[in-house]
Structures are given as structure tokens and as C-alpha cells.
């Protein structure tokens, strides 16, 4: 007897697992769309002129098992030594409870930015804990919910200082003891804005000549200085004082607020987040209350819901780029929410006593190490330090460094004659012995019990982390349950489709995520010798080659840490190109009115003037307006920024005409890669006339959104722009660093690399085709009930569609927000609201969603339309109905029901699961109350008790 062959690939072939609809379901969906097959649908959707000529030549897809084995082999080529290099990156211990329940938990890492507060209360509380931690440690009133890295935070603080300072100066003072990468990124940011950077000795600073100053605390070479007098001098001349501070050191040392600092920034990396060869890590920023509206980044605040119960939300959003555009405080979009949550949980896990004990142990080891070196005759500097010292070894520098490597230790090269040593949480007594041996010391007093090695007046006297949340979860059982309670309040991709237009919330597969936690990727210091990072080098080179093939560009830079930072880096490369050609005067950037808010904000950051371009009635770029303005500004045209396919969800046929006109008038073309999920394998921006693009690896290439970060936004360029890609002080060359580490956040790259390897070229192309199919299926199913605002010439949409709900405001008093909140009752995150057109919903299903989930969403939308019809026709009260009262909570269900519709209709609309229903923890959040009564730190414990009841 023989078995009949079954057409079934092994379970671990990702291209069968990543793509949601089965082949049979695709056939059914194609019938609904009216397309004969996928090829015909692609022909209808993409203009022939923009199709790429050759398929992706990646080879066949590898199975999950094969890819993981391959990644193990590559990772093993990295040599993970004990790095005592410091310079802003330190060994830390990630509590397994946090690694398992946060970092490796899809309930946390697949969530989106918490713009819909009712379904984001868990991570909003965790981020509020982060803000409280930062505010307490720095001694400043208001903190944000993270920035990309410490160097970026320094640059943001500099430009914030310029905004709020009353000084007329254009100069900014930088402490020479700042980390070199911080100085480099500030210099990059300052140049196009006309800010003069003065690097020098703080004691010789001319406070009258600057609008602000930044000081490193402790300094990059270990100095612990009191900057109180410097702050007073700055304030006397209406200038702003900034401190870039190590938060762990602040558990022992005088806080920046007590010195008079106006702004504090830094990295929370050593709060349980591994070095990761540079990232990702959550930077922080805190400031005085008077300056809170000028602070970049997201701020979590406390508000109330429609029943008066406490609720969290993102506050002061009118500062942000998606609203203010070129007038925004920054182009910050993606931040580091997941890493901020980890850092906050590290503080909750250890509490103030635990953090202080960790800091004390590190300091004692540093003092013990210094004493052993001094007793052996070495000169150690500084005398006052926290965890970092430098040692004068004269001509023996290279020998000592090599000897340390032989002992399994990386030290820092300082100048020509000194060696730097920074101790950390992972250091043990045998670490000190290995360092001593590298210096030729065979015996030292390892039992010495040292005192503090900084002046008594520098000891911190104020309390911190006094809120009960930092004192209540010592047992791991309670910690585990606390993290579970928070995640249960949220709606992430592990529960339901998140159909956010322009956000590409696709599957982040378990196999892709696994390598992030491997020690060979996670424990490498970004400034370790390059020969210790051979695995990273191989991976980055191969992934870069694949991305070049996908985009049609010639070179890739992995340095940008987000899409917005990629935009900034790309525009800097264009500016560098013009400058090299003697055309530095080119400073006009043409940007369509429909562009992402980051586009005009990024253009402003490189010192350009934004000239907006009108949209035609069909949503396309108004070509007459574009051509006229390109000609009008030809003498000064730097370039244009466009998104393709457009932000309206359509492949515009005029894209090559846009690029031709721009080049004709001397400009360069930036094609925003936000919608690359509709192009991979089908069309390449480099072939359309693009000179530079960024890629959102946290969209198209499967890095998870993490509730608002991490992200990566590498840029691809044509060869003529390659000399102007971001450089780094550790790698040399280029126009200047935009991130703290040479490759941004490289510990995320195994995710995108694994995705490419597991899908293969054919699989990546099929993913694009199915993403387009899914969007067209939704558009067709909703046809008749809702208008799709924009379509291509053949009636197709790209990978997303814009649903027009504006008529319902007039016919039934139903707003786009009402529909978004009603979708929560159905168990869905709302699509993108009021963008690119106010009063619309932009839907992007991605290729990962099954037909069943797409149908559930469509059923929910159609049921909502029926409810709107009931209001329109008088069958339902216009003010008291399921849409106006959405979302409904368990409290609503079990309380006295006095509404003119049933409990069942209110709480269990079509699309909602009855058994596994998601219940939002709060009713609709009051946005106005939250901004008028801004509270950005943890509320009193009584409020937590109330919530628990």
C-alpha cells in the first residue's frame, strides 16, 4: 500500500505561515474583487511603467529550522568578551522575569503606538512609570516617554534649548567630557541650523556667549563634577543648562535638578537592556515644568474617561510632527517604547533600594580596582568618579589593551597613552583580577572595603522612586502578575488585526524574534574591536545587499534608528551632495500636502524651506502645481519628498514625471519608504528616479512596533550620494553621525534578515501581492456601504484604502472617532484616523491576515454602517446610541442599564467574540481634560486601589 502524496510543505516554511490567506481563500477573494488571478490584479493595480524588470534573485526560501541554524553559525562568529569600554554602554543583567514577560512577549512587542488610549492602558501605565522614574532620578518635573538614543536626545535637548532660551546667541557650549558620539551627533544636528558648537572646558565657558550648554555627568572619562555654579552663570544670561546623566549614577549622586539644570537627558540602557552592539535602548529627557510644551517626543499623561474614572493618554499631541508638520518641536515619531517599558520594569523589579545597591556595588568595585592599580604604581584619573577611570600607561597602551583582550576583557583606548575602564553590573571579583593581570599586577587587595570616591557634597540627599509602584512587586509571582495585568488591558497583534494605514502591522514571527535574545547578538559592545563582530559584519553586509536589490539603490546605511531619522539622514546626504557641488544655496524642498508629517519636519531640521504642493481631486500630486513650483524655485531647489505608493493608497502614474521634473531643475528625489510593503518584488524606488529612500524595517521587514518603538530606518542611495551617507567616529568617513552607534540598533537586524531568508525572493514578492489583494478585498466588501475615497485608474487600491466617513457627521452626527471607538467594541484597533484626509479611516490589512479576520473586520464595519443608518432613519437616538457611548466596558455590562439599546447590542456587536471578547478597561478618554490638567507622573496609590476594585 502506498501513500497518496500530499501537497504540503514542512510546517516551518515561513512563506506558508507568514501569508494569511490560503491558496483556496485567495481564489475566493479574487472572485470578490473581480480579478481573474493575482497577476491580473497586479496588472490592474500597478502601472506597467513602474514594474521592475527582473524578479528578486535571493534563491529559494529556507525553512525556519535552517534559518535559525544559519543564524546560530553566523552569531557564533561574534566574539563576546567582557567589555569595560563604557562610553555610554555598560554590561547589565536583564532579569529573566522581564526578558520572558516583556521582551519576548507578543502582547508587548506587537502593540502599536498608544494613540487609541482606551486599548492601550497597560503600556501607558508602564510608560508613565518610566516617566516617573526619570523625573524622580533627575529631579525635574516632567519627563517624556523615551527618545531614540542618548546622542539623539542630546541633539534634541540642544534644539529645545534654542527654542526656549531668551538669549540671542547662536552658539551652544558642549562639555569636552561628553561622550564622543554625543558630540558628533550634536555637531551633525547643529550645522544645517546655523548653530555654532563650542567644545571646551566647562570652567572656561563664557555663559554670556551661548544660548545653552550641555554637561556629561559623570563625564566620559569618569569625572564627577558639580555643575551648580555653571547653571547659575547660564541662567544669569538667560541661557539653558542641560545635563546628560547616567541614571544609575543618579541613585548615588546629586541629581541635575538640584544643580539647577533645566533639561536632563541620558540613556536607560543599563536598566536591564543589553548592549546589543549599539541598540535599541531607550533614551530619556526631562525638563522643568515651564518648558514641557517645547519638549520633543511623546508624553503620557493622566486624564479621566467619560465616567470620570482615571485613564491614561498621550498628552500635548499638538507638539508632534503628525499635526505641526514643519513647525513641530522635532521629527520624532518612532521612539523606544518597548525598551522604556523594560527599563521601567527594571526599576519596579529592583526598587530604589535595589538600584542603589547595584550602583554601590559597581562603585565599590571601581574604587577597589583603582586602589590596586595605584598601589602598583599607576596614575589613575580622576580622583572623584563613579564607575569609570583612566590609567596612564605611557607607551604600553597597545600592549595593555592586547593583554586585556587575552584575558577576555575589552578596555577603551584614550588618547595615545591612557586606557579607560568602566565597570558595570556584570562585573565580578574575577573581572578585577583579570584587569589587574592585564596591567601586570599579580597580587592586589581584593578584600579592601572602600568608601565613596567622590566628595560628600556630591552624595544625593533627596528621595526617589517613592511611589508605591516601586515598592510593591518584590516577589516574582507578583511581578509576573503585574506585567500580565497590564498586557491584558491592551489590544495588540496577538489578539486581533491592527488595520492601521501606513503602519504595516504584519506578523512578527516567533522564529524571527528568537535571535534577538541570543547572547552572541545581545551582549556585544558597539565599540568593541571590529574583528570581534564578524558575525554582525556578515549579517549587515548580506542584508544590505538584499535591500539594495529590493530598492534599486547602490548603497545602504543602517545607522538611522527610525524612519524619521532615516528621512533626516537622507536629506543630509542630499545637502552634502549639493554642498560638494558648490550649490549649498539649494534649500527649497517640494512636499505634497498629503505627505507624512515627518517629511516637512525633517526638511526643517536640515535648514530647508518647505514649499507645499497641492493635491488633485483624485488625491494625486497636482502636476501643474508641482511643475510650476519646481520651475519657480529652480535656482534654489534642493529636492522633493514624495511617498510611493501615495499616502492615499494609490500607485500614481505620474511618479516618473515628478522625478524627471525635479532632476531637470537641479533637485534630488527623496522617496519615502513608508509604503514599501506594496512594492517589494514588484517595483523599485531607485528605478523610478529616486535618489534616496528610507526603509521602515519595523513595517515592511517584520521588526515589531513595540508599542511605539523600537524601529530602524536604514537609507538606500544612488552611488552619487554614497559619499554623503552618515559616518561615525568609530568607522570614519561620511557626512556625520545621526545615531549614537555606527549601525543604529543592530540587534534588531536578525529579525529582518531572517524574514528575507525564510521568505526568499519569491516569498517576499508574494507577500506584496497578497497585501494588495487583501486591501482590494476589503475595499470591495465595503463597497456600497462606504466610499473608498481614492482609487487608481482601473478602480484598484494599493496595499491600503481610505474610507470616507465624513458624510455621516452630517447625516447622523457620527464622527470618525465614534466609528473608531465602536470598532473597539468589535475587538479591533481602529484604522488610521483623519489622515491623510480629515474625517476618514485609512485601512491597511497587510499580507499576514487570514480571510476570516478580514471578514470579521468587514462584518464589523458593515454592522457599524447599519447602526448609522438606524440613526439616520430615526430608529436610534442621535445622542444616546452604541456609537456615541463606545467603547463599552465590563462595568457598563454589569451596571444598571438605562440606555435605549440592549446590553447585547452595545457590548457584543457583529465581529466581537463572545467567549474571548476584548474588554477595554476604560470608557472613552477625555482628551481636553488631560491637556488642561496635565499630570505626567504616577498618580497616588489610592487611584490604583480604585482601579483594582
From Swiss-Prot:
Reported cofactor(s): pyridoxal 5'-phosphate
A Pfam family matched in the record: GcvP2_C
Alphabetized UniProt keyword annotations: Oxidoreductase, Pyridoxal phosphate
Top-level EC class: oxidoreductase
Superkingdom of origin: Bacteria
Biological process according to GO: glycine decarboxylation via glycine cleavage system
Molecular functions (GO terms): glycine binding; glycine dehydrogenase (decarboxylating) activity; pyridoxal phosphate binding
SUPFAM superfamilies to which the protein is assigned, alphabetical: PLP-dependent transferases
Role: The glycine cleavage system catalyzes the degradation of glycine. The P protein binds the alpha-amino group of glycine through its pyridoxal phosphate cofactor; CO(2) is released and the remaining methylamine moiety is then transferred to the lipoamide cofactor of the H protein.
Homology family: Belongs to the GcvP family.
Protein name: Glycine dehydrogenase (decarboxylating)
The gene coding this protein: gcvP
Amino acid at each position: 500500500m502506498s501513500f497518496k502524496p500530499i501537497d504540503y510543505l514542512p510546517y516551518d516554511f515561513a512563506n506558508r505561515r507568514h501569508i494569511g490567506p490560503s491558496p483556496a481563500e485567495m481564489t475566493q477573494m479574487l472572485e470578490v474583487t473581480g480579478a481573474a488571478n493575482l497577476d491580473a490584479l497586479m496588472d490592474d493595480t500597478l502601472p506597467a511603467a513602474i514594474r521592475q524588470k527582473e524578479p528578486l534573485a535571493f534563491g529559494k526560501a529556507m525553512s525556519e529550522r535552517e534559518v535559525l541554524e544559519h543564524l546560530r553559525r553566523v552569531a557564533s562568529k561574534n566574539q563576546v568578551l567582557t567589555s569595560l569600554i563604557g562610553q555610554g554602554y555598560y554590561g547589565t543583567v536583564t532579569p529573566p522575569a522581564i526578558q520572558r514577560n516583556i521582551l519576548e512577549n507578543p502582547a508587548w512587542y506587537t502593540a502599536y503606538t498608544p494613540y487609541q488610549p482606551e486599548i492601550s492602558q497597560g503600556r501607558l501605565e508602564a510608560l508613565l512609570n518610566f516617566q516617573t522614574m526619570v523625573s524622580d532620578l533627575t529631579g525635574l518635573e516632567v519627563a517624556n516617554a523615551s527618545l531614540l538614543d542618548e546622542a539623539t536626545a542630546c541633539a534634541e535637548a540642544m534644539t529645545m534649548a534654542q527654542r526656549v532660551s531668551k538669549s540671542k546667541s547662536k552658539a551652544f557650549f558642549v562639555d569636552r567630557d561628553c561622550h564622543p558620539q554625543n558630540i558628533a551627533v550634536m555637531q551633525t544636528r547643529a550645522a544645517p541650523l546655523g548653530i555654532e558648537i563650542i567644545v571646551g572646558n566647562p570652567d572656561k565657558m563664557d555663559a554670556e556667549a551661548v544660548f545653552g550648554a550641555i554637561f556629561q555627568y559623570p563625564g566620559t572619562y569618569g569625572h564627577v563634577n558639580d555643575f551648580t555654579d555653571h547653571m547659575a552663570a547660564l541662567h544669569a544670561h538667560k541661557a539653558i543648562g542641560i545635563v546628560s546623566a547616567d541614571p544609575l549614577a543618579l541613585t548615588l549622586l546629586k541629581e541635575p535638578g538640584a544643580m539647577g539644570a533645566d533639561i536632563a537627558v541620558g540613556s536607560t540602557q543599563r536598566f536591564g537592556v543589553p548592549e546589543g552592539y549599539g541598540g535599541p535602548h531607550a533614551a530619556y529627557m526631562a525638563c522643568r515644568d515651564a518648558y514641557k510644551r517645547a519638549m520633543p517626543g511623546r508624553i503620557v499623561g493622566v486624564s479621566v474617561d467619560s465616567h470620570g474614572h482615571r485613564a491614561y493618554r498621550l498628552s500635548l499631541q499638538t507638539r508632534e510632527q503628525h499635526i505641526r508638520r514643519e513647525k513641530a518641536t522635532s521629527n520624532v515619531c518612532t521612539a523606544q517604547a518597548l525598551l522604556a517599558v523594560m527599563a521601567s520594569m527594571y526599576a519596579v523589579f529592583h526598587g530604589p533600594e535595589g538600584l542603589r545597591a547595584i550602583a554601590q556595588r559597581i562603585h565599590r568595585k571601581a574604587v577597589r580596582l583603582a586602589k590596586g592599580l595605584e598601589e602598583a604604581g599607576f596614575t589613575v584619573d580622576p580622583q572623584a568618579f563613579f564607575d569609570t577611570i583612566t590609567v596612564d600607561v605611557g607607551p604600553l597602551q597597545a600592549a595593555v589593551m592586547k593583554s586585556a583582550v587575552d584575558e577576555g576583557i575589552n578596555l577603551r583606548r584614550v588618547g595615545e597613552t591612557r586606557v579607560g575602564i568602566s565597570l558595570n553590573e556584570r562585573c565580578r571579583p574575577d573581572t578585577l583580577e583579570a584587569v589587574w593581570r592585564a596591567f601586570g599586577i599579580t597580587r592586589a587587595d581584593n578584600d579592601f572595603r572602600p568608601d565613596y570616591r567622590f566628595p560628600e557634597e556630591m552624595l544625593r540627599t533627596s528621595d526617589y522612586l517613592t511611589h508605591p509602584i516601586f515598592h510593591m512587586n518584590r516577589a516574582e509571582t507578583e511581578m509576573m502578575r503585574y506585567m500580565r495585568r497590564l498586557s491584558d488591558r491592551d489590544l495588540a497583534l496577538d489578539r486581533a488585526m491592527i488595520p492601521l494605514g501606513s503602519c504595516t502591522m504584519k506578523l512578527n514571527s516567533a522564529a524571527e524574534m528568537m535571535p534577538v535574545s541570543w547572547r552572541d547578538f545581545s551582549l556585544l559592545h558597539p565599540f568593541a574591536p571590529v574583528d570581534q563582530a564578524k558575525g554582525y559584519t556578515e549579517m549587515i553586509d548580506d542584508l544590505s545587499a538584499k535591500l539594495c536589490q529590493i530598492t534599486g539603490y547602490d548603497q545602504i546605511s543602517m545607522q538611522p534608528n527610525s524612519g524619521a531619522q532615516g528621512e533626516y539622514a537622507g536629506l543630509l546626504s542630499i545637502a552634502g551632495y549639493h554642498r560638494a557641488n558648490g550649490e549649498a544655496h539649494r534649500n527649497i524642498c517640494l512636499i505634497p500636502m498629503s505627505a507624512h508629517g515627518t517629511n516637512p519636519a525633517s526638511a526643517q531640521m536640515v535648514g530647508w524651506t518647505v514649499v507645499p504642493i497641492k493635491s488633485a481631486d483624485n488625491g494625486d500630486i497636482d502636476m501643474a502645481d508641482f511643475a510650476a513650483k519646481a520651475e519657480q524655485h529652480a535656482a534654489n531647489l534642493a529636492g522633493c519628498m514624495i511617498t510611493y505608493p501615495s499616502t492615499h493608497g494609490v500607485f500614481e502614474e505620474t511618479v516618473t514625471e515628478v522625478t524627471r521634473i525635479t532632476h531637470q531643475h537641479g533637485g534630488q528625489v527623496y522617496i519615502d519608504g513608508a509604503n514599501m510593503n506594496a512594492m517589494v518584488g514588484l517595483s523599485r524606488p531607485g528605478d523610478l528616479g529616486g535618489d534616496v529612500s528610507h526603509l521602515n524595517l519595523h513595517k515592511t521587514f517584520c521588526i515589531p512596533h513595540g508599542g511605539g518603538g523600537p524601529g530602524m530606518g536604514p537609507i538606500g542611495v544612488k552611488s552619487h550620494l554614497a559619499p554623503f551617507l552618515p559616518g561615525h567616529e568609530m568607522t570614519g568617513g561620511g557626512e556625520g553621525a545621526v545615531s549614537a552607534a555606527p549601525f543604529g540598533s543592530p540587534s534588531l537586524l536578525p529579525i529582518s534578515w531572517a524574514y528575507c531568508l525564510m521568505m526568499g525572493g519569491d516569498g517576499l514578492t508574494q507577500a506584496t501581492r497578497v497585501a494588495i489583494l487583501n486591501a482590494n478585498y476589503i475595499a470591495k466588501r465595503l463597497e456600497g456601504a462606504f466610499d473608498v475615497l481614492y482609487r487608481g485608474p482601473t478602480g484598484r487600491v494599493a496595499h491600503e484604502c481610505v474610507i470616507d466617513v465624513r458624510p455621516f457627521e452630517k447625516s447622523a452626527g457620527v464622527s470618525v472617532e465614534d466609528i473608531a471607538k465602536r470598532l473597539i467594541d468589535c475587538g479591533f484597533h481602529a484604522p488610521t484616523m483623519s489622515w491623510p484626509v480629515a474625517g476618514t479611516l485609512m485601512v491597511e490589512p497587510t499580507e499576514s491576515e487570514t480571510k476570516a479576520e478580514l471578514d470579521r473586520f468587514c462584518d464589523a464595519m458593515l454592522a457599524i454602517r447599519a447602526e448609522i443608518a438606524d440613526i439616520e432613519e430615526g430608529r436610534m437616538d442621535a445622542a444616546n446610541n452604541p456609537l456615541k457611548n463606545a467603547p463599552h466596558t465590563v462595568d457598563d455590562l454589569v451596571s444598571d442599564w438605562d440606555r435605549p439599546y440592549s446590553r447585547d447590542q452595545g457590548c457584543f456587536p457583529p465581529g466581537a467574540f463572545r467567549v474571548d471578547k476584548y474588554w477595554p478597561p476604560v470608557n472613552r478618554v477625555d482628551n481636553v481634560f488631560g491637556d488642561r490638567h496635565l499630570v505626567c507622573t504616577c498618580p497616588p496609590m489610592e487611584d490604583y486601589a480604585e482601579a483594582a476594585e
